[in-house]
Amino acid sequence: MKILGISGGRKDGNNDAMCKEALMAAKEMGAEVEFVRLLDLDIKYCTGCTACVGSLMTGKGNMCVLKDDFDWLLDKMLDADGIIFANPIFCKGAPSLFLTIRDRFGPRMDRGNNVVATKIAEATGGKAPDPRILKDKVVSYIGIGGSDWVTRFQCDSAIQALTPMWKVINNEVFPWSTGIVVDKDKVAKIHEIGANIATAAQDIANATYKGEEGVCPHCHSRNFYLDRESTHAVCCMCGIEGDVKILDGKVSFEFPEEHLEHAHDTLSGKLIHADDIKKTVAISMELKKSDDYKQRLENYKNFITATKPQR
C-alpha cells in the first residue's frame, strides 16, 4: 500500500506540514509514503490542443505534447494506491497550480476516454493507454485558508477526482488556519484524514466517503447552479439535475434516480458526454470546410494581432 502526499504550498509552510502530518498517520497504518511539492516542479498550462484525445482515439496510447514534469508526477500518482493533496486556498478556491494539474488530467486521464481507447487499441492492434489509469484509487483533499473565504475549494478539488473516477475519502476545508501547525484539534483532524485514506487504500472497492455530509446526496457538493425562477438546480460537481427543497429549515437536493446515470463522475455519464462531444466535433469539422467559416476566421485573424512583450 502506497500513499502519495502532494503539497501545493510553499516550502516548509502550512501545507507541507499538514501534508506530512497526514502521511505520518498513513505510515503508522503500515503504508509506504512519499511526498511531492508542486512548486518544485515545472508544470505547463494545458493549451487545449487535444493531441491527447487524438492519440487515445487512434490507438496510439496516451500522449501529451508538452515537455515538462507532469508525466513524472503522473507516474508517481498512478503508482500510488491513495493520494493526499494539501493546498492553500486562493480566491476562495484551489490554487492555480492545482487547477493546471486538473486541466492536464482532462480529457487525457478521463476514465471513459481511456476505456474506449483501450478497446480501440485491442481491436486495431494499436498501443493501449497505461493500464494503471483504469485502476481504482482513493484521494483526499485538504484546504488551508486564512479566513472564511473558502466556499469554492471543495468543488474545485473534487472535480480533479471526477476525471479519473477516483474515490474521494475526505474533502476538508480549514478556514482561519494560518496557525494550524499549533492548533491541536485541527492537527488531530489532519491526522485522522491520513489514517482514513490508509484504511481506504487497503480495500478500495469498499472504501466510502468519510467527510462531512454535503447537500448533494451523490457527491456531497454544496455548490449548485440555481434557476432563479424555480427550484431546479444543477450540482456544480457531479452535474446531476434536480430540485432544491427546504424542510424543517434544512436544505436538501433531490433528483430522479434515472438522472444518476448522467452524473459526470460515473462511467455511464462519461460515455454520454463522450458521445455528445463526438457529435459536436463532427458538426464543427463540417463547418470548418465552408467558405463562410474560413472567411470569418480570416477576418478575425487579420483584424488585430496579439501584443507580446519583447524578449
What is the meaning of each model-derived region?
Residues 1-86, 90-102, 106-107, 198-311:
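N-terminal beta1-alpha1-beta2 submodule of the flavodoxin-like/Rossmannoid cofactor-binding fold
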